């Protein structure tokens, strides 16, 4: 489905796609929680494909998965599968065996900050952001705020580099900046891809379990008409939440399409 179609159908349901502010907050909060930026080693990278079964972490609620290093300490016989020699495939949950001893359970999906596959599997086409790339705006992210105002944030113009810095600022924007090139294990441990052709939408999350694709990864190389089996998005809601008067009233709610 194209960005344009996903945007239309989500709006028809009173929803939107996950947006730039939401993704930035997820990244920043995950860094704050774990005190590191390499979320693929912290929470695992997941199975190395873009066709994972949704709901693989549902039985564990919002508990985050763990990565290879932490799982290995508990069980040194876990699957050791490196992707491109850089990142460990799969993720694990801490558990107990029948004798009460600590063990781990391997899963295909990752869960980071309570979000299943917030990176890997499929790209998230983001709402409320694009790169106009017109005169004077090369590489600038145009971000629509919840109140309708627009901010222009200058990002880096070099494509295919490992991220070494982000704009941050008042809104803690995860917009890649600078001209240095990092690596899969330094700085933000993820990559940025950009086209300076006019009007590019922005994807986050990456696909597969590539080392380049954690919570700070961004791809601003496609227009709104692009479609692919490994590109999708997430429904999100911004607005006023009203408490139902009763359980019966809540159950009586019907989707407005």
Label each PLM-derived region with a short phrase.
Residues 1, 8, 14, 18, ...:
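Disulfide-stabilized, aromatic/cysteine-rich ligand-recognition loop
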Residues 1-118, 257:
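Short aromatic-cysteine micro-motif
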Residues 123-124:
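Generic structural signal for well-ordered beta-strand positions
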């Amino acid at each position: 489905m194209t960005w344009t179609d996903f945007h239309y159908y989500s709006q028809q349901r009173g929803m939107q796609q996950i947006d730039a502010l939401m993704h930035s907050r997820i990244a920043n909060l995950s860094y704050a929680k774990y005190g590191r930026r390499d979320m693929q080693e912290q929470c695992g990278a997941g199975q190395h494909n873009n066709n994972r079964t949704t709901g693989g972490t549902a039985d564990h609620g919002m508990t985050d998965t763990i990565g290879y290093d932490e799982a290995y300490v508990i069980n040194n016989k876990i699957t050791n599968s490196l992707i491109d020699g850089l990142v460990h495939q799969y993720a694990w949950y801490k558990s107990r065996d029948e004798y009460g001893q600590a063990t781990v359970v391997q899963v295909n999906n990752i869960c980071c900050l309570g979000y299943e596959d917030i990176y890997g599997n499929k790209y998230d086409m983001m709402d409320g952001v694009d790169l106009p790339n017109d005169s004077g705006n090369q590489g600038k992210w145009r971000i629509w705020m919840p109140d309708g105002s627009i901010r222009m944030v200058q990002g880096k113009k070099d494509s295919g580099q490992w991220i070494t810095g982000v704009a941050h600022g008042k809104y803690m924007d995860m917009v890649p900046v600078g001209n240095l090139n990092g690596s899969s294990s330094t700085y933000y441990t993820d990559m940025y891809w950009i086209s300076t052709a006019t009007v590019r939408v922005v994807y986050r999350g990456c696909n597969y379990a590539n080392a380049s694709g954690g919570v700070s990864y961004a791809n601003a190389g496609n227009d709104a008409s692009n479609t692919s089996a490994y590109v999708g998005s997430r429904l999100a809601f911004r607005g006023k939440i009203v408490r139902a008067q009763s359980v019966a009233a809540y159950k009586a709610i019907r989707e407005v399409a």
